[in-house]
């Protein structure tokens, strides 16, 4: 039982960290939304920018 309790506390700390990172990403997204919107639309039509955009998203 002790072992289970330990793992549970560990997961909770991890979740907290992830949540903080997510909020930061959201704020950044809001900042670049206006600028990125025009570019993303043009890139999607071409098709080559789509791969690049996904990679950038993953890094965040």
UniProtKB/Swiss-Prot annotation:
Protamines substitute for histones in the chromatin of sperm during the haploid phase of spermatogenesis. They compact sperm DNA into a highly condensed, stable and inactive complex. Testis. One of its GO terms (cellular component) is nucleosome. One of its GO terms (biological process) is sperm DNA condensation. The lineage of its organism: Eukaryota, Metazoa, Chordata, Craniata, Vertebrata. The gene is PRM1. Keywords: Chromosome, Developmental protein, Differentiation, DNA condensation, DNA-binding, Nucleosome core, Nucleus, Spermatogenesis. Disulfide bonds: none annotated. Belongs to the protamine P1 family. GO terms for molecular function: DNA binding. Residues 1-60 are annotated as: Disordered. This is Sperm protamine P1. It is found in: Nucleus; Chromosome. It comes from the Eukaryota. The keyword DNA-binding applies.
């Amino acid at each position: 039982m002790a072992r289970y309790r330990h793992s549970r506390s560990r997961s909770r700390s991890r979740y907290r960290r992830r949540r903080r990172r997510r909020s930061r990403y959201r704020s950044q997204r809001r900042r670049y939304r206006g600028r990125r919107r025009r570019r993303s639309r043009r890139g999607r039509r071409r098709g080559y920018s789509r791969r690049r955009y996904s990679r950038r998203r993953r890094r965040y």
